[in-house]
Swiss-Prot record:
UniProtKB keywords: Keratin, Repeat
Family: Belongs to the KRTAP type 4 family.
The organism of origin for this protein: Homo sapiens
The encoding gene: KRTAP4-3
Sequence ranges of the Sequence repeats: 34-38, 39-43, 44-48, 49-53, 54-58, 59-63, 64-68, 69-73, 74-78, 79-83, 84-88, 89-93, 94-98, 99-103, 104-108, 109-113, 114-118, 119-123, 124-128, 129-133, 134-138, 144-148, 149-153, 154-158, 159-163, 164-168, 179-183, 189-193
Coiled-coil ranges from the UniProt annotation: none
Protein name stated in the entry: Keratin-associated protein 4-3
Amino acid sequence: MVSSCCGSVCSDQSCGQGLGQESCCRPSCCQTTCCRTTCCRPSCCISSCCRPSCCISSCCKPSCCRTTCCRPSCCISSCCRPSCCISSCCKPSCCRTTCCRPSCCISSCCRPSCCISSCCKPSCCQTTCCRPSCCISSCYRPQCCQPSCCRPACCISSCCHPSCCVSSCRCPFSCPTTCCRTTCFHPICCGSSCC
């Protein structure tokens, strides 16, 4: 005897008998016409049943990873795809090159592959993240002092390297005593305190 399954007709006669809709969410019963909010159960998570209304935490499987299914409860390592890169879905397991977006820049997501200009935050200042596009005032740490990162705001005592001694690296008060080194003795840097 055929029973009703989630508002449609069940494909398996053994489905939906006795326990109603709960017993109806079986792989053999999960047809596209059977995907309703009331039918979203773990056993119902198959490719043909991945609809937005079915996107609940218990239904987050790789086969269900679609743009319409990107929700915080669905952020698992097997579901980290570019289309799922939203602020609420930024977890360490999701930190991949395709997921480097400003809203995804969290301390646990600072990896070399994520070092892009839009991802330069203080918490991301690591040696592997020292790139020209990442040279902002909040990101100037000693290990970031590279020739490509020599900017006026980067002129601090810990950043006085020969490679950083360029005209654009003048400190506000000429050359501080900590910067007075023979390797850094450029005419543009020769102030009264540096003689």
